[in-house]
Regions:
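Conserved ABC transporter NBD signature motif
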Residues: 11-22, 26-27
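Conserved ABC ATPase "signature" region
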Residues: 51, 55, 62-80
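Conserved catalytic motifs of ABC-family nucleotide-binding domains
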Residues: 105
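Catalytic Walker B motif of ABC-type/P-loop ATPase nucleotide-binding domains
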Residues: 109-113
Length: 198
């Protein structure tokens, strides 16, 4: 819903200043998205994926050229520019997918389980990319099941049974629930949930 792909049945929502009910196309123009499964085309080369997504977002040719080289250099993928994406290690794919999702400099980027299946060192590198994007003024919206990873965020929203049960900074949530970790906070909220019979 927040990405403008499906319409909500009720309520109010705005993303990047646009109403998700009436301005879904504007929402799509001002966001980036990285899915849980890779959002790259496996049978395209690294540089082809970058150019494809840049073109989809309507970037100018001279900007695409310049930024492609900068991105390849920053990710240390210059030597792999002509490599098919399916040949890259999982961590490299994740970093490339994230970088492509913000290539057009959106106001907000949605990351769906972005570090699933990668080793701890790659997770740390990935979060450095997230921090860099945030420093550039991009709002980063992360969904994760890794509560230790949630600690890296400025604000956390915890949903239980489709409803937001908590929303605050990690420190305040831990204080509010008398917990040492975000995992403890989540456990307390989940245990307190009333389950409906199937």
């Amino acid at each position: 819903m927040l990405c403008g792909l499906s319409k909500p049945t009720s309520g109010i929502g705005k993303v990047a200043g646009y109403d998700i009910f009436r301005e879904a196309e504007q929402v799509k123009k001002h966001i980036g998205y990285m899915s849980q499964k890779f959002s790259l085309y496996e049978d395209l080369k690294v540089w082809e994926n970058i150019r494809l997504f840049a073109g989809i977002y309507g970037m100018k040719e001279q900007d695409i050229e310049r930024k492609t080289e900068e991105l390849l250099d920053r990710l240390e993928l210059t030597a792999e520019r002509d490599t098919l994406v399916k040949s890259l290690p999982v961590g490299w794919k994740q970093k490339l997918a994230f970088s492509v999702s913000i290539f057009h400099e959106p106001r907000i980027v949605f990351l769906d389980e972005p570090t699933g299946g990668v080793d701890p060192a790659t997770r740390r590198q990935f979060w450095e990319l997230i921090y860099r994007a945030a420093d550039q003024g991009i709002t980063v919206f992360v969904t994760t099941h890794y509560m230790d990873e949630a600690e890296y965020c400025n604000r956390i929203s915890i949903m239980v049974d489709g409803q937001i049960k908590a929303l605050d900074t990690p420190a305040r949530l831990k204080q509010q629930f008398g917990a040492e970790t975000m995992d403890d906070v989540f456990q307390k909220l989940a245990r307190g949930a009333v389950r409906k019979a199937d």
